[in-house]
Amino acid sequence: MAGLHFIAQEPICKGWSQDKKYRVTDAQGVHYLLRISPAEQYDRKKNEFERMRTIAALGIPMCKPIEFGICDAGVYSVQSWIDGTDAEEAIPTLTREAQYACGWEAGHILRKIHSVPVPENLEEWAVRFNRKIDLKMEKYKACPFQFEDGQVFIDYINENRSLLNDRPQVYQHGDYHRGNMRIGRDGKLYILDFDRDDYGDPWEDMKAITWD
């Protein structure tokens, strides 16, 4: 790694990302987040790193992208480390007022994330999402396990496909929920893990709320 030298590393085992993640420490005792991905993902990870720079420039509270490159283990990125507690653990311990404030701030931050410019040549949202619906329905019909009265749900979806027409598309975080947030020691909310980012309907970025 060109500009940084680490004297200690601690693996991070939380999360579903396929990246190997470490909290690393330099000689001055400063902590960083180190992510390592397979070498064949170079182009995708390079683009992801550049998009993170764009997002950080908006003032989004997040792990700031610092360095990107290739190492013996694959493709690496170094980001600033957020001292604090995972939001999944911290938020249930807060007062209702403080929880509400975190939710409001999360929405405010997401609105900023959605302000990142999108490519002009994006496929229409209705085309993209209808294709996804069709695939899910095909898999459901091929599954030997069926819900009682499951056809009611299928009919409802088919009857409302027109709502997908003419929808705006924005830059999406892609995995926006408490598991990818952190409450810093300064009490502020920070956003983590942009490795599932995408473009699409702004409401789709709220899908992970069902996991919270």
Pin down the residues of each PLM region.
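An alpha-helical support segment within catalytic cores of ATP-dependent transferases
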Residues: 1-2, 104, 112-174
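Conserved catalytic motifs of the protein kinase core domain
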Residues: 29, 74, 167-169, 187
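Active-site Asp-x-Gly
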Residues: 169-171, 184-212
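ATP-binding pocket architecture of kinase catalytic cores
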Residues: 11-124
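A short, local hydrophobic-aromatic micro-motif
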Residues: 7, 63-66, 192, 207
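Generic detector of well-ordered alpha-helical packing
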Residues: 49, 81, 174-176, 194-196, ...
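Conserved N-terminal boundary motif of the eukaryotic protein kinase catalytic domain
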Residues: 3-11
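Hydrophobic residue at the +6 position relative to the catalytic HRD Asp in the kinase catalytic loop
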Residues: 179-181
